[in-house]
Amino acid sequence: MPSFDIVSEVDKQEVRNAIDQVNKEVGTRFDFKGSDARVEQADYTLTVFADDEFKLDQVFDILTTKLAKRNVDVRSLDKGQVEKISGNKVKQLVTVKTGVESELAKKIIRLIKDSKLKVQGSIQGETVRVSGAKRDTLQEAIQLVKKSVTDFPLQFQNFRD
């Protein structure tokens, strides 16, 4: 029975490379001269440091540009609150979302069932497995999910006959 998986993954190494590029660019740019602006990574949590909120926004813009150039979908970034740290320096936590959350998975399954396609969906951890009798109906299901879910980056993997 043909099937495929709907997942949401981010290449950790590409994120690391983008952060290295951001830190290098911030270190060489004239408008950041003498500032302590940088980005640090701990697993899928990024911390953006800067002297003030304006520079923090500039560093975040550089980060999103570098991630986009490295084919990392910026919709997977979740910005946290801006926190004041020592003096007038600020930091912001940015979480890189991976995996299909259960609420989104339920929405995808409901969408597939409501479409009356002859496919079945099941939640398996952080992935959604969709299986059906025909390959064409699975491809229709892929197109349906691509059109409907635009606010979260999804990939379609393990297409099997």
UniProtKB/Swiss-Prot annotation:
GO molecular function: nucleotide binding
Keyword set includes Nucleotide-binding: yes
Nucleotide-binding keyword on record: yes
Alphabetic keyword roster: Nucleotide-binding
A Pfam family of this chain: DUF520
Cellular component terms per the entry's GO annotation: cytosol
Family: Belongs to the YajQ family.
Function: Nucleotide-binding protein.
Protein name as annotated: Nucleotide-binding protein Nmul_A1044
Species this chain originates from: Nitrosospira multiformis (strain ATCC 25196 / NCIMB 11849 / C 71)
